[in-house]
Each structure stands twice: as structure tokens, then as C-alpha cells.
Amino acid sequence: MLGRTLINKHGFLIHPRRFVHLNDKSLDGTFILPSKKNHMYDVPTNDPSGILNASDIDRINNLPFFDNTSPTKETNTKEGALLSEKLASVKELFGEDPENPSFINYRFPRGLENPYFDIQVNQLKKKRLSVTQLCTTQNWCELRNFYDFYSQNLSNQLLNLKFQVQKGKKIHKSLEDETHPELNQYKSFTHNFLALTKLSMDIDNDMDALLDNWFNSINRLVSLFTKGDGHAREIVCHGFINLEDGKLVEHLLNSDSKTKENVIISGVIDHLTLRNKHNHQVQKGAAHLDTEYQSWGNILTNLLSNLKELKSNNEIVISDIKTRSVPKIPSIESVIESSKLQTMYYKFFFSHLSQDMTQTYHSFLINAKRRGLDVDAPINPTKILTFILTNPLFANDVKNLLYGLPINHSAFDNDAKGSNTFDMAAFNDLLDRGPTSFNVPIEQDEDSSESTKCVSLRDYGHFYTKWKTPLTLKYFAARLSQIYFIVGNLVSNDLMIEYYYHNDNFHNIIFPYDTLKLGTHAHDSAMVWFGGRDMHPIEPTQKNFNTYCKFCDYRHVCSWKNKNELKLIDLGKELKKIILESSMK
């Protein structure tokens, strides 16, 4: 019986030995509960009855303490398997530290080009970086972050198993749904509509995702000035960073052939707030526009003509939302600084996209082309039909394309005609078979409880023909360039981080935009992504190891941590020796 390790039904280790050791490890290497001060206590038991038998263990199992203890969940087993796979993958790629065998090297793998090409271009097939990727290089430990980037698939799977990550996603989603309920309503309508009409939506996933992002961004930003409550969430933006010098690109170019050395940086802004510039009150319907019988184009023309007046009284604040597991802001300054920089990038991008509408139009097209999309290809007609049925502003706007009329955007109007055609004539068949009336979601007014209205496919029969101007991504890029020009001119120099615990916004940090700080950070991050420098691990102090490494997946295999902790131990011994010798003199 002595020397055996027993596991009770709750997964706790029980050591039936004559001496009870209350330090962090038992003699055979298995972990047991530590005492508060991590001392070792030997409790001699000469009585053989002190050895636990099966009956004793059964009694322990039935103690009240164990009644509230859950057995190990299956997800923990899955998490452990994924972690083992990730560590093996990183070790295989980075290799062992030649100076410290069995521990992972802390320099980039030789024979590979650089993280941007290794991870983004070759592994993920994405010719772009994200704001998050630039900001997370230094927010914690750069070494850990790049280990994770190089094992991205496994790292993401592990993250998705973590409760706090799931909780954070739910909070972001609930805020988006509260501000923009039309998204879920559209998805529900589309699902039912396709089932009833037996239509299919054959559209490439990348095209579908980009189209949804562009459509929603236009709609939400227009709504910010009309019927919205002064808020818009989950808005896409992008900019460029130079591959050679690591500088953010300040001036847009019209041709992708001139920007090959520039890498796209994409981002999604959590929250925009339209407020009065003088009293900081949130502005609802600041443009005072009646949207009935209006179109995107009419509203944008009105906003552009009144931009000077709008700018004199209003501003838009960019916010980033951070979720917390406790109602406290992060105690580590680098984490807060990373969030600030993330918001500064968004501010820079909106400034970049509000310089000139023609250049912004081409910038969005370059973005689409870098994703491998054909900007001249007609968009799936079924997708467009669902937009027409659910969004009157869009439906009224695309009549210009139907009849071959200009949309009052010079770059698009000179660029729109092509050899491709856009034909919705096949939808005439819907009028002779199956249902023709459907309930579609509508924007709710404060004095109305109606969330849907009935529409008839027959009311949209004029669209079911060959259009004179093809509906392509170029149309959406044109409308994006107009609304981003408007919003970019209103963006405030005051930026904000919003901290949420559950659904409670318990703290905000407001801070100024800092061009110099942003430029320095962009260059330093670009250098590591594009191979200009190696990874920078954390400064090797015991405080840092206790703070940064405590929950790191790589803490047991990290050579940087292991080697420097041993140095600190040796240093401690040397200091102790020096003190002892000096005291004896």
C-alpha cells in the first residue's frame, strides 16, 4: 500500500503514506496540495491504521467537500490533447535550443523567409495583416505570440475552448445585435426565403464575406446619420504598410501595380459614436433626413453637401471594446497600451480613407483584388434580390444601374461599363410558381411595434431583366468611398477603450491620438513581421517570469525562461555567498 498513488472518483490524487508531505510536489513527482507558505511538514504515523485502505478512500469520496466538485470535463481532455499537439508543432518548426536541449529555440526558424510570408501568404493564403496582429506582437510576450502565430490553427482551436474567450465573443455579439438587429433579421429572412422559393445562392465564400461586410458597413454608417441611435458597430476599415521601410502609407494610389510593395492592414472597428462636439451628447438622426422614398445615393449627396455644417457641430469617436473576467482594468500597462494603439490604427485608416473619394474607391478595389476577387464579375443575382427585398434604400439606389443612369460618382460612372452582364430575368419564373408574398424585416420606429412588413415579389418585377449597368463590387466600392469620406472627416482625435464585465460597461479610458507613437509602433511591428529583426522575449526578471509566464502554454518548454531563471538562481547564490563572506570579515 505504501508508495502507491490513488485517484478518487473526482480526479484528486491521494497518497497513502506514513509521512504526509505538504509541499508542491510529492517525492514521486506527482502534485499534491501545497500549504500556504509552501513549507514541508512531516507527520510521523507509527500506527498501521494510519495507512488508507479502500474503506477510508470511500469515506473521503463522500466528504461534503467532494460533493461540490465536478469531475474533469471532456473539454479539458480535448484542451490537453490540442496543447500537446501545438507544443510538438512549435518545437518541430523552431527546433531545440542548441545551448539548451529539450527546450524550444527562441529565434525564428532558419530557412524560412519571414513571418508575413511564412504565416499569412504561404500558410493562410492571405496577402494581408490585421491590426490585431500588429498590436499583439508586444502586448504580452512577443515570443509567445509568434509561437502562437506559427501554430495558428491549433492556437485558435485552443482559444475557442476557453470560457473567457467565448464570453467575450458573446458580449461583442450582443452589443452588435442590440445596435443592429437587422443583421439577424436578414439572415432569418434569407434562410426562409430560399427554402420557400427553392432558390440557391451559389456564391464564393470569400466574395460572400466581403460583400456582407461592405453592405453592412455602408448601411450602418448611413444609419448613423439618419434613423440610427448615434451608434454603429463592427465597421470594416483598412490601410497599407510598406514592406521595405515599415512605414504606414499616408497617400493612396489609384493602381495596384504601384502598391505591390505595400501590404494591406485590415481591421474591424468595434464601436463608433456620433456626438455633439461641444457638449458630447450622443446625436440621434443628426442629418434630420426622412428616409422614406430615399436611396443611399440621395442621402450621401445630402450629407456631402452639408458636410461643413455637420463637421462644425459633430464628431465621431472611435472605441475599442475589451471584455474582462473581473470588473477591473488590466494591471499591465503594455496590455492597455496595445488597446490604445489598436484604436489609433483605426483613426489613421479613416483619415487615410477620407482624403479623396476617387483614391478611396480604388483603395477598396485593391483590397478586393488582393483577396483574389474579380471586381468586374457580376454578383450573384439571388444575393442581390435578398438585399433589394430587405433594404429599400439599396433597392431605390440600384435602379440607377438597372436603367444605366450615373450614380454621381465620377470614378465609378467612368469605370462601370464592361463586357459582363447582370441579368435577373430568371426571377420572372417565381411569379408563376410558389408564394410571391413574404414578411421582411423593417427598421422599427419608436412609435411603432411592427418589426416586419409584407412585400410582394410582383412589386419588384421591374428588376427582373437584364440591367444596363452590371452590379459588381465596383458599385459597393463607390458608395463606401463616399460614406468613408464623410465619416473620416468627422472622426475625433479623442479615442476610447470601453471595458465590459458581462454586459456592464464598468470603465472607459479616453485618450488622444498620437501620430508619432503610432508611427513608431507600426515600424517596430513591421520589422518583426517582415524579417527586419528577431522576436523580442520579455525582459528576464523574476517579476516578469511570475507575471507573464504563469499561464503561458510554453512555460515548461521555453528556453528563454529556463535559461534565465537558472541564471537568476546562480546570481542569487553568488549574492548570498558574497554577503556571507563579507559578514565574516
Curated annotation (Swiss-Prot):
Cofactor dependence: Mg(2+); [4Fe-4S] cluster
Residues annotated for [4Fe-4S] cluster binding in this entry: 141, 549, 552, 558
Protein name, per record: Exonuclease V, mitochondrial
Family: Belongs to the EXO5 family.
Keyword Nuclease: yes
Native organism: Saccharomyces cerevisiae (strain YJM789)
EC number: 3.1.-.-
Gene name for this UniProt entry: EXO5
Keyword terms, alphabetized: 4Fe-4S, DNA-binding, Exonuclease, Hydrolase, Iron, Iron-sulfur, Magnesium, Metal-binding, Mitochondrion, Nuclease, Transit peptide
Keyword DNA damage (UniProt): no
